[in-house]
Amino acid sequence: MISTAQSKTLLGLGASELERWAVSQGQSAFRGRQLHDWLYAKGACDLQDITVLPKAWRASLQDKGVIIGRLKEQDRKVAGDATTKLLLGTDDGETLETVGIPTDQRLTVCVSSQVGCPMACRFCATGKGGLQRSLYTHEIVAQVLSVREVMERRPSHVVFMGMGEPLLNIEAVLDAIRCLNDDLGIGQRRITVSTVGVPRTLPRLAELAMERLGRAQFTLAVSLHAPNQSLREELIPTAHAYPYDALLDDCRHYLAITGRRVSFEYILLGGLNDHPAHAEELADRVGGFQSHVNLIAYNPIEEEEFQRPTRDRIEGFRRVLESRGVAVSLRASRGLDQDAACGQLRRSRQK
């Protein structure tokens, strides 16, 4: 159920919740089912657009301040590869970015979980502006609906890899996953939650997911970005509070609770963490997990002078991991020409 602070917002509620809510408003459960259809299938943005509802009831809801909870598009950038970045505004005046990443076979939506981010990873633009607040469930779901509306395609995949640290907003993220799965028909196995790691939260995520979702079939992607603690602290300031071994232990705990393997992410920074010796060290760390490692070539941001690795360095790093029996892939940098790639999202319109 939505929080008290958002009790007049309908987006994020499931079919049975909308039925109960309609009855509580003196209407039939059928009106709740109509609302569900218009919120999720038809993508209504305003209650006054739902003309199948009685006009008097719509007016009454408007007087009470009841809203759907959609976000307002403030800017749009379309890259040469058709990746689309949206700057969206919230009801309280905050802004966030979300990205639609299309291929012939799928449409992936990269959603934000917070306005800004407190983790301050040196290679990421989002953390440069700090954290304003966490997003509500409806604000996460609304991002997917905005991308669907703009790109005129049904999203097939959702990745929590936009602005913010999802594990600092666990309850809203899990409620959003429930809504995306049940109400928008996006399978859990097509949803990925990415985290840089927050102490003591992975076991809690596992337990809450089992409790709220009945199962935890979404993919958990843990961002390592370094093969050892000292280099990780250099790149991720908050890592000093979360020793590497403790993070990996929590990954094992997550696997034990959910039965789902953890995948790992590693951003390659030219001349800093992309040496074959780093790959060997990383293989030592993650080899026992039988997990997948996703390599990401650094995407430039204005505030830092990190270098994108050469193709030879990337392939060399990959070959070392593969020679050690580690499953590995390289993520394509989509939307790079419009600052829509991994690590480039911000809270405000960019010139």
Curated annotation (Swiss-Prot):
Molecular function per GO: 4 iron, 4 sulfur cluster binding; metal ion binding; rRNA (adenine(2503)-C2-)-methyltransferase activity; rRNA binding; tRNA (adenine(37)-C2)-methyltransferase activity; tRNA binding
EC number: 2.1.1.192
Binding residues for S-adenosyl-L-methionine: G164, E165, S194, S223, L224, H225, N299
Source superkingdom: Bacteria
Gene Ontology annotations of biological process type: rRNA base methylation; tRNA methylation
Cofactor names: [4Fe-4S] cluster
UniProt-listed InterPro entries: Aldolase_TIM, Methyltransferase_A, RlmN_N, RNA_MTrfase_RlmN, rRNA_lsu_MTrfase_RlmN/Cfr, rSAM
Keyword terms of this UniProt record: 4Fe-4S, Cytoplasm, Disulfide bond, Iron, Iron-sulfur, Metal-binding, Methyltransferase, rRNA processing, S-adenosyl-L-methionine, Transferase, tRNA processing
Annotated binding of [4Fe-4S] cluster, by residue: C117, C121, C124
A Pfam family assignment: Radical_SAM
One annotated Gene Ontology cellular component of this protein: cytoplasm
Cofactor binding, note field: Binds 1 [4Fe-4S] cluster. The cluster is coordinated with 3 cysteines and an exchangeable S-adenosyl-L-methionine.
Annotated S-S bridges: C110-C342
Record carries keyword Methyltransferase: yes
Database matches in PROSITE patterns: RADICAL_SAM (PS51918)
PANTHER family hit by this protein: 23S RRNA METHYLTRANSFERASE (PTHR30544), RADICAL SAM CORE DOMAIN-CONTAINING PROTEIN (PTHR30544:SF5)
Family as reported in the entry's similarity comment: Belongs to the radical SAM superfamily. RlmN family.
Protein's name in the database: Probable dual-specificity RNA methyltransferase RlmN
Gene name in the database record: rlmN
